[in-house]
Amino acid sequence: MNALVRRLLPGLASLLLLAGCATAPLQPVNVQWQSHQVTLEQIQHYQLTGKLGYIAPDQRQSFNFQWQKSPQKLSLRLSNFLGQTVLNLQVDEQGARVETYDDQIYRDQDAQSLIRNLTGLDIPVEQLEDWILGLPTQATHYELNEQNTLATLTKLASTEEWHVEYQRYQAIEWQHQPIPLPDKLKLQQNKTSIQLVISQWTLLP
């Protein structure tokens, strides 16, 4: 395991156990789905919190996460079960920046590479901007469930093929109307698996 992770996560060996949920029957794209896509693309400023479970051949971890997105910036904070910050990532037009627990600052143009080099975690941050909303932007293939929201998608990102399974949605109010947003999804790439369970969505104007 990466030395930085060992220092940051003393004694953290438990994996977040998250039960799977069956996907609803698939249904072809229709006008309702196209309208839903347009609505999702209008959401530019939001926050969410939840749990992230990470499984790879060389490590298994569980984190609390906070995700904030605005038109100018994306931020991701991972913390352990004691509330100690493991990763504090900021991404803007200047690139990606990570500030560590001991006030060291690291930069890279690619957020995924920066996280991987510092922690050994392979998290497709920039693709998650759309995936976490339920948007299949430039996906190689995607399928819908019977509610006309995403059931699965597959996308080649940075030479890696990621498969995303949307296991559960919740209704969140947006512009005085409820819209379905993901609250449980699983990302898979080769032998790496990431489980996200979202406990709170906050959509901002």
Curated annotation (Swiss-Prot):
Q: Where is the lipid attached (S-diacylglycerol cysteine)?
A: 21
- Which PROSITE patterns does the entry link to? PROKAR_LIPOPROTEIN
Q: What domain of life does the native source organism fall in?
A: Bacteria
Topology class, membrane: Lipid-anchor
Covalent lipidation (N-palmitoyl cysteine), chain numbering: 21
Where is it found, in Gene Ontology cellular component terms? cell outer membrane
Q: Recite the UniProt keywords alphabetically.
A: Cell outer membrane, Chaperone, Lipoprotein, Membrane, Palmitate, Protein transport, Signal, Transport
Q: Which compartments does it reside in?
A: Cell outer membrane
The positions making up the signal sequence are 1-20
The family database entries (Pfam families) matched by this protein are listed as: LolB (PF03550)
Repressor as a keyword of this entry, yes or no, is no
Q: What is any one GO biological process for this UniProt entry?
A: protein transport
> Record's InterPro entries?
LolA/LolB/LppX (IPR029046), OM_lipoprot_LolB (IPR004565)
NCBIfam families, from UniProt? lolB
Summary of subunit composition and partner proteins: Monomer.
What does this chain do?
A: Plays a critical role in the incorporation of lipoproteins in the outer membrane after they are released by the LolA protein.
Indicate the family of this protein.
Belongs to the LolB family.
Give the protein name, as stated in the record.
Answer: Outer-membrane lipoprotein LolB
